[in-house]
């Protein structure tokens, strides 16, 4: 039995299998066949070179087929490969271009890739251009001129502005500007009743301010969904001011009382000092009388006259006192 032809046959079969595996790995034949059937002009060599460049054909070729079927013949394989190698999402870009074409929205390929590379979902942006998005704002608190606090909630309908998606502000900026406009509108109202009666006045005033300037969206409408009455901020501020004024008045009154007490104590000290001076002066009287007797300037009759005057003065003082007071001293001889 000849064994060599059998080994040769096995070797050829194994080699053929390995060749077919490598061929279908590096050259996606069925993908090429699908592209040919769809009318996309691409060769097996180009598919093989995609593998060499680490570009997956199963991403590029379906995108080319979708674009060709949608009538977007200006999209080339090289552009899709370049966008993939730049880190973009080929599927999103192709879907967005097809949707924009069907909706008659002008969206060049370069703009779509720029939006995608900027980190935004270009397909979602196109969908928002066709179907506007409704954004609910968080509760916005504002105070009218009469001091009543109002809590408002709004619904903002926006549409994506494709030309502003690169470099334009996002939803957070829209919400912040709308909240600022609501606060300004309520704050300029004379009273809270006028706001409750005409909530659409807030929407009209906010829309006139052009809050979507420099953003990636176009504001279509602003609707006030709900308005609640909060605290009476004006009354609370008046109460706080009254309490502050009361505390200030009490502090000033306490200061005046302390000054009055200090003045009273000072006057008492001065009175005690005056009494001490009087007592000291009275202590000098007997000495002066003795000196007058010795010098002959004061006679005995003058002395008795002085004593009588003192007795009369004491009697008058006792008469002027209430009943129960001390009796007058007897006249001295």
Swiss-Prot record:
Subcellular localization, as worded in the UniProt entry: Cell membrane; Membrane raft
Chain segments annotated as transmembrane: 10-30
Topology with respect to the bilayer: Single-pass membrane protein
Keyword Transmembrane helix listed: yes
Gene Ontology terms: cellular component: membrane raft; plasma membrane
InterPro entries with a match to the protein in the record: FloA
Coiled coil: none
Subcellular location, principal: membrane
Keyword entries, A-Z: Cell membrane, Membrane, Transmembrane, Transmembrane helix
HAMAP family xrefs: FloA
Function as written in the Swiss-Prot or TrEMBL entry: Found in functional membrane microdomains (FMM) that may be equivalent to eukaryotic membrane rafts. FMMs are highly dynamic and increase in number as cells age. Flotillins are thought to be important factors in membrane fluidity.
Quaternary structure and partners: Homooligomerizes.
Name this polypeptide is given: Flotillin-like protein FloA
Native organism: Bacteroides fragilis (strain ATCC 25285 / DSM 2151 / CCUG 4856 / JCM 11019 / LMG 10263 / NCTC 9343 / Onslow / VPI 2553 / EN-2)
Record gene name: floA
């Amino acid at each position: 039995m000849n064994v060599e032809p059998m080994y040769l046959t096995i070797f050829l079969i194994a080699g053929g299998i390995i060749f077919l595996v490598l061929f279908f790995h590096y050259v996606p034949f069925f993908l090429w066949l699908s592209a040919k059937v769809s009318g996309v002009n691409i060769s097996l060599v180009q598919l093989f070179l995609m593998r060499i460049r680490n570009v997956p054909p199963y991403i590029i070729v379906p995108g080319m087929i979708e674009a060709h079927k949608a009538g977007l013949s200006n999209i080339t394989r090289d552009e899709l490969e370049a966008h993939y190698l730049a880190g973009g999402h080929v599927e999103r870009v192709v879907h967005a271009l097809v949707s924009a074409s069907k909706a008659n929205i002008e969206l060049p390929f370069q703009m779509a890739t720029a939006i995608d590379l900027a980190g935004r979902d270009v397909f979602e942006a196109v969908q928002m251009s066709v179907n506007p998005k409704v954004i609910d704002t968080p509760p916005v608190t504002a105070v009218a001129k009469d001091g009543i606090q109002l809590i408002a909630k709004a619904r903002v309908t926006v549409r994506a502005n494709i030309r502003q998606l690169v470099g334009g502000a996002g939803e957070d900026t829209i919400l912040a500007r709308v909240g600022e406009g609501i606060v300004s509108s309520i704050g300029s109202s004379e009273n809270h009743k006028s706001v409750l009666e005409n909530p659409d006045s807030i929407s009209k005033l906010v829309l006139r301010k052009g809050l979507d300037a420099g953003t990636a969206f176009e504001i279509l409408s602003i609707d006030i969904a709900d308005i609640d009455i909060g605290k009476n901020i004006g009354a609370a501020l008046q109460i706080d001011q009254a309490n502050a004024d009361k505390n200030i008045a009490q502090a000033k009154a306490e200061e005046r009382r302390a000054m009055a007490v200090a003045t009273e104590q000072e006057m008492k000290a001065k009175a005690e000092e005056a009494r001490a001076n009087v007592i000291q002066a009275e202590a000098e009287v007997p000495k002066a009388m003795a000196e007058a007797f010795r010098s002959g300037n004061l006679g005995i009759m003058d002395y008795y006259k002085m004593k009588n005057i003192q007795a009369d003065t004491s009697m008058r003082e006792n008469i002027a006192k209430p009943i129960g007071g001390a009796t007058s001293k007897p006249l001295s001889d």
